[in-house]
Amino acid sequence: MVPGSEGPARAGGLVADVVFVIEGTANLGPYFEGLRKHYLLPAIEYFNGGPPAETDFGGDYGGTQYSLVVFNTVDCAPESYVQCHAPTSSAYEFVTWLDGIKFMGGGGESCSLIAEGLSTALQLFDDFKKMREQIGQTHRVCLLICNSPPYLLPAVESTTYSGCTTETLVQKIGERGIYFSIVSPRKLPALRLLFEKAAPPAMLEPLQPPADVSQDPRHMVLVRGLVLPVGGGSAPGPLQPKQPVPLPPAAPAGATLSTAPQQPLPPVPQQYQVPGNLSAAQVAAQNAVEAAKNQKAGLGPRFSPINPLQQATPGVGPPYSQTQATQLPPGPPGAPKPPPASQPSLVSTVAPGPGLAPPAQPGAPSMAGTVAPGGVSGPSPAQLGAPALGGQQSVSNKLLAWSGVLEWQEKPKPASVDANTKLTRSLPCQVYVNHGENLKTEQWPQKLIMQLIPQQLLTTLGPLFRNSRMVQFHFTNKDLDSLKGLYRIMGNGFAGCVHFPHTAPCEVRVLMLLYSSKKKIFMGLIPYDQSGFVNGIRQVITNHKQVQQQKLEQQRGMGAQQAPPGLGPILEDQARPSQNLLQLRPPQPQPQGTVGASAAAGQPQPQGAAPAPPGAPQGPPGAAPGPPPPGPLLRPQNPGANPQLRSLLLNPPPPQTGVPPPQASLHHLQPPGAPALLPPPHQGLGQPQLGPPLLHPPPAQSWPAQLPPRASLPGQMLLSGGPRGPVPQPGLQPSVMEDDILMDLI
């Protein structure tokens, strides 16, 4: 445990990135349920700030992100060594992922591919860092759960960390400030060595003995960056108190092992009355044999995903107080067939990837909520009937609390020439509450004004979201265009902040409108701490603008430092129009070849710079997708192959006021009527910002004929191998597109 890093409970404003790296082999399967109950679920509850609940809509915009990596052994071929689940902000959904792991294979192996799992986890943390640019540093924790030492093999499946050994990977984890923890049912010296090597360089903490937090003397629990309950009996959600661990070798015949399932739900209790001298693996083997007999007898289903279905059964309470996952209890034949509405975790535990298409069942809005996590895009116009129908059905058992009009402003979908043009939309809406709740809406105004906020800015307000009452918004589809626009905006990374005017004598000052992509409904959160929530929004917006200012300054500095020796003055001249453009014109997706002098000069379009779809993250205009700003052009691989280009490099023309950048004057070097050439495959998207005003070779010669293969010069190393300089950053989108909204809020 890191001394002084955490208190006994979770800090209120903790924003964490959590990755569980789990061995998905049969070597861990018999012990996983005990580890899950005593260590994994308390850890999830620590980061979540409370027990995971399916109705926690604040998790969609809350701070903590969870991700799951499952690795195997070398005998899993031809399957991939690692299965990675897309990040989710819902702790409830993350628990369903844990319940859906199939522990198979690895019986003939004494080691596991820990290096593959850790290399994938490091790539996840790299992605988290890009996602978290708006809020800065987060609390990052990597938890390894395994029951075997690592192979002495480097990682091969990871693109970024290929060739790194397990020890190298844990050292990288420690150097990057990621807290590394290990949970294992056995005390393995190789795993303890990994834990020691993952210590941050500046942290020389004494290791606490594992017995302080372990629930079983055989377990090895080494944790950093989180707090687990000490001793037995404090694990959340057990149906009965934890049985005492039989420390002497000869235990009474009725004693049970702590890793064996102890719940009285299954109707075969005789398999739990085992002698105390049997190991946990033997107990699990007996359970598996008994379950196999029951399956052959037709008493239970023949597939293992019965566990996610049992986890999703309503009315049981917390998701971790149900049937143990290490055995399949033979229930009645109709048991694994609950109605579809009670199966929210079925799809998400099978393949939670971002590439899954939304379900095409317009008549089943309850199943539409089972879209795999990561699919956060708004519904297509053809599917708008399903959410509207689902909203009507879901409010039938609620009370109408308020009826009026919701108004908001958005930018027109076809980008207008005038950046200040806004489209005002309004929709009739109703607010519903549950039976027994009293929401005083008599003083609410007839029209509510909503302002859009990028949901990335709300990640630090997760505790305030949880400490709020929940109402449901229902919109009538009289204005279909406005309804489509609302679904499109709210489903693509925005939340609505509804301000109540000070003239209205109501106790509510701010209300957050959130769209749940899983439930397909609009939820309104009314924080109990109104003043704290308003101050929190102001604070995150202020921090956001400071971060953006720092990034712009860093990019200007980086662009000047990374220029090749002869390009300093050229880069400075090119930076000026880019900066002016950043202040004057927001990025607009434009078709190829329609930007003034670029089209006139035959300026080519960079590969991969097609106009971005609406809602796609766009960087600053100097690096935005679409035609580059006038001035920089793509640079050929070897400037020395063309003497005219070489002389242009050495003697750049001085910039003149009121004259377009030099590519128009250099147009005579290209044959008239020549079509624009595409850049070579090695050309990166970020290179137009660094290259001087250069030309492409005439189309009569191909790239290989014009530029024969030769060794790269030292100066060219800076311009190859991917984007350099001011490249588009996903986190820079709100700085240009939503500045007016943020200023209104401040």
Curated annotation (Swiss-Prot):
User: What ranges does the record give for the region Interaction with VP16, renumbered to this chain?
Assistant: 389-543
UniProt name for this protein = Mediator of RNA polymerase II transcription subunit 25
Q: Which GO terms describe its biological process?
A: positive regulation of transcription by RNA polymerase II
Return the annotated region ranges for Disordered.
233-273, 298-390, 548-746
State one Pfam family annotation: Med25_VWA
Biased region (Acidic residues) positions are: 737-746
Q: Low complexity compositional bias: what residue ranges?
A: 252-262, 343-354, 599-610
> What UniProt keywords are attached to this protein's entry?
Activator, Methylation, Nucleus, Transcription, Transcription regulation
Its annotated compartments are: Nucleus
Q: Which family does it belong to?
A: Belongs to the Mediator complex subunit 25 family.
Instruction: Name its species.
Output: Bos taurus
Positions of short motif LXXLL motif: 645-649
Modification sites for Asymmetric dimethylarginine: R724
Renumbered to this chain, the Pro residues biased-composition regions fall at 238-251, 329-342, 611-633, 651-663, 672-682, 690-701
Which InterPro entries does the UniProt record give? Answer: Med25_PTOV (IPR021394), Med25_PTOV_sf (IPR038196), Mediator_Med25_SD1 (IPR021397), Mediator_Med25_VWA (IPR021419), vWFA_dom_sf (IPR036465)
